[in-house]
Amino acid sequence: MRGAYYVTIALLVVASSQISAEFGHQLQAYDHDVTAADDAVAETLAKRSLRGSRDVSNDVAIEERTKYSNVIEDGIEMLLRAAEALKEMPRAAVAVKDMPRAEEAVEKMAPIAEQDLLKNVIGADEASKRRRAPHGISTQRTLALPFKEWNTELKQMRGGSVLKKYRSKIKSVHQAFVDLCDKDLNPTVTETALLWGMFDWDVKSYSASAHKHNLIRLAKRYVHKDVVQIQSDDLAWNRWNEVSIPLRIGALNILLNLHYQRWVRMYNIFEQYQSALIGTPVSLELSLGGTTGTSSATALDKHLEVPMNKASTSKGKSSVFTRSSKRAFDSKTGTTSPSSKHSKMQRSSSPLTESTTSGDDPVFTKRSRHGVAVTSLSSISN
């Protein structure tokens, strides 16, 4: 209470000084309840002001700071917080009421865990029954060769053919492969033989990276064939030479990606059904060539359930085909007879010529209508 007493005294003194100032009088200073004499020097009370308040022109700046002002402010804040806490108490009570008990939570968790476990088991069983798709080569890759890659001479475009070991079965394999592919792919006999040859490589060469590199080279050769076709038309070739080099490179890359995506799609399909397409000749003949009234794709689908015989090997190199038998099997009588189909195929004249290979990369392309052309893509810069 001493602080309040001092505050009251100070207010009275200030009020008295204001009144005396209005009447032109000055109050006498008191010190310890002692009144100064009439002839004594009058002294005023020392002014106490808050820090930084001397610049204020009103009388509030003369008030003395007390510690109770901070206490009052803290009390007001505590009251506000208490009021907010009282408002939140009903909400907290409702939340506690709705909170699930431990027993109820345990009862609900058991059925959920059983359902998830049953769902996972069913999903795993269905996945095991489905045919596992191979990884294959991604179709999301976009090729963009620079000018340096295009400004190089490619090898001579040569006529391609089916290798001798594939000739006896290439027609049935090609027909089954066409049925498996989409209509927009429409693979040719030579393309089927080329894919067959890629999967008939040595084990060391059988890798996705090597196949991917080979598919890029095949797509690049197809672009070369497109350029050869443009050269055969004088008007189209003149227009091509009028285009700037960057635009030519962009057009070549577009064609390259079109051919590459087509090759990748055919490659992935052939890899997925590899065991059925290039299985042993006898089982392949019975499932594809021996069926009547049904499509090759249906026969191939049934053939997927038939286990394959072991492939023959020679000189350390694996081959998915055994030597073709010269005797045909009669399913009705259960006897074998000499096959005339094989000799007819050998005597028949094939429109495909013998292939020439470079290393492990055989060239299987159809002979151009305009003949063999030796062209360099470096001419695009001329």
Swiss-Prot record:
<dbReference type="GO" id="GO:0005576">
    <property type="term" value="C:extracellular region"/>
</dbReference>
<feature type="short sequence motif" description="RxLR-dEER">
    <location>
        <begin position="48"/>
        <end position="65"/>
    </location>
</feature>
<comment type="function">
    <text>Secreted effector that completely suppresses the host cell death induced by cell death-inducing proteins.</text>
</comment>
<keyword id="KW-1048">Host nucleus</keyword>
<comment type="similarity">
    <text>Belongs to the RxLR effector family.</text>
</comment>
<keyword id="KW-0732">Signal</keyword>
<keyword id="KW-0843">Virulence</keyword>
<feature type="region of interest" description="Disordered">
    <location>
        <begin position="308"/>
        <end position="382"/>
    </location>
</feature>
<dbReference type="GO" id="GO:0042025">
    <property type="term" value="C:host cell nucleus"/>
</dbReference>
<feature type="compositionally biased region" description="Polar residues">
    <location>
        <begin position="310"/>
        <end position="323"/>
    </location>
</feature>
<protein>
    <recommendedName>
        <fullName>Secreted RxLR effector protein 118</fullName>
    </recommendedName>
</protein>
<keyword id="KW-0964">Secreted</keyword>
<feature type="signal peptide">
    <location>
        <begin position="1"/>
        <end position="21"/>
    </location>
</feature>
